[in-house]
């Protein structure tokens, strides 16, 4: 009986590459010349620092663009609402969603059940296990999960026949 797991993970290596590319782009940008701005990655948190709030938001856009180039889904970003002002700099913290939260997992299971596909889905910790009689049904579930607007990117692993 075919089965698969739906998970939400961020590729650590690609994320680090995206941050490094963002730092490289920041150094070459004309609008940041002579300004105090930085992008740092530590403990799965990206810290964006700039001289004003507008520039912090520009840094978020730079990071988002570089993440999409490196095939890291920007939907996994969790950006602070307000920039923290300390001294003459503003800083934003960007966290990344790892694992599927229980509420999102319940919505995903309900979405799968409402689709009337002949599959069973169950929540297992921070992933959702889907089993069905045919591989085609699982592929339809994959398409359904990708199209869903649940605010989180999904990956599929442990696909077994």
From Swiss-Prot:
Coiled coil (residue ranges): none
Superkingdom: Bacteria
InterPro entries given in the database record: DUF520, UPF0234-like_C, UPF0234_N, YajQ-like_sf
Disulfide bonds: none
Nucleotide-binding among keywords: yes
One of the record's GO cellular component terms: cytosol
Keyword terms: Nucleotide-binding
Pfam families reported in the protein's UniProt record: DUF520 (PF04461)
Claim: RNA-binding is one of the keywords in the record: no
GO MF annotation: an example: nucleotide binding
Matches recorded under CDD domains: YajQ_like
Entry-linked PANTHER family: UPF0234 PROTEIN YAJQ
Family to which the UniProt record says this protein belongs: Belongs to the YajQ family.
Function recorded in the entry: Nucleotide-binding protein.
NCBIfam families hit by this protein: PRK05412.1
HAMAP family: YajQ
This protein's name: Nucleotide-binding protein Shal_3198
